[in-house]
Design a protein with these regions (language model features):
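Macrodomain-like recognition of ADP-ribose-binding/processing modules
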Residues: 2-269
Length: 269
């Protein structure tokens, strides 16, 4: 690890002891140096994990990993299960080609287990961890995640920020803060900014939890419509930049909603 050593000449120490102004200057200087050292240490730790081979990093996982090959695309899921899937509530399906339908998945499981490029954290504005999926991600990633988050200056509703994944199977975590209550524009921004950050960093596989539908009170079906419509628009405009978007679902009610709405937004037969 990089070590920082500061040598202070005797004449500066003498000035420091005599002047309150100089005291303030030195305190501010050392605080700045300390913050710089802290950021350098965080970056060093992040890069250590990012540069590991897959085999080496697997030794650091806190959970059994799920690979992208273990998750069916919506196209494959539909072809396998369409005889058993209800079509009663599907209005005005929006046709897409099979290639686009292969770029989305719905999956019930633990988002912290996904061995992909990035998982999205439904964070709070401090980025310092909380309950639900936020707390689960922080626990699985380890304490280095909180140290990096402390350098980011928080996050506003609808914005997104990126950190390393540390002990997670995912290489990166994209943190976004969902709205409290039903605010469609802000929820849409969460998905748009998260996808934009993924593409900016050449991350081709990404998983979303259901943002804002828990204690933040956004109705599940309304939130799912925004998620699917926003992801569909992004894929249509950037089909060559994203390989898979996974909607990670925890509740059976979420699975039922996505199974219904995927027939509308990603219909291909």
């Amino acid at each position: 690890m990089l070590k920082l050593q500061v040598l202070i000449p005797n004449q500066f120490l003498h000035q420091f002891s005599r002047s309150s102004t100089n005291k303030l200057f030195f305190i501010q200087s050392f605080t700045t140096l300390g913050n710089l050292y802290s950021k350098m240490s965080v970056e060093e730790e992040k890069q250590k994990f990012l540069k590991m081979s897959l085999e080496e990093k697997r030794n650091h996982y806190q959970i059994n990993a799920t690979t992208i090959d273990q998750i069916m695309s919506w196209k494959d899921y539909w072809l396998k299960n369409k005889a058993a899937i209800s079509r009663n509530n599907v209005d005005d399906p929006e046709k897409v080609d099979g290639a686009l339908a292969s770029k989305v998945s719905m999956w019930q499981g633990d988002i912290t287990s996904l061995e992909i490029d990035a998982i999205v954290n439904a964070a709070n504005s401090s980025l310092m961890g909380g309950g639900g999926v936020d707390g689960a991600i922080h626990r699985a990633a380890g304490p280095s995640l909180k140290k990096e988050c402390a350098t980011l200056g928080g996050c506003q509703v609808g914005e997104a920020k990126i950190t390393g994944g540390y002990h997670l199977p995912a290489r990166y975590i994209i943190h976004t803060v969902g709205p409290q209550g039903e605010k469609p524009d802000k929820l849409r921004e969460c998905y748009e900014n998260s996808l934009g950050l993924a593409m900016k960093n050449d991350l081709r596989t990404i998983a979303f939890p259901c943002i804002s539908t828990g204690v933040y009170g956004y109705p599940q079906k309304s939130a799912a419509k925004i998620a699917l419509a926003t992801v569909k628009k992004c894929l249509e405009e950037n089909e060559d930049k994203i390989d898979r978007v996974i909607f990670c679902l925890f509740l059976k009610s979420d699975k039922d909603i996505y199974e219904e709405l995927l027939q509308k937004y990603f219909a291909f037969e």
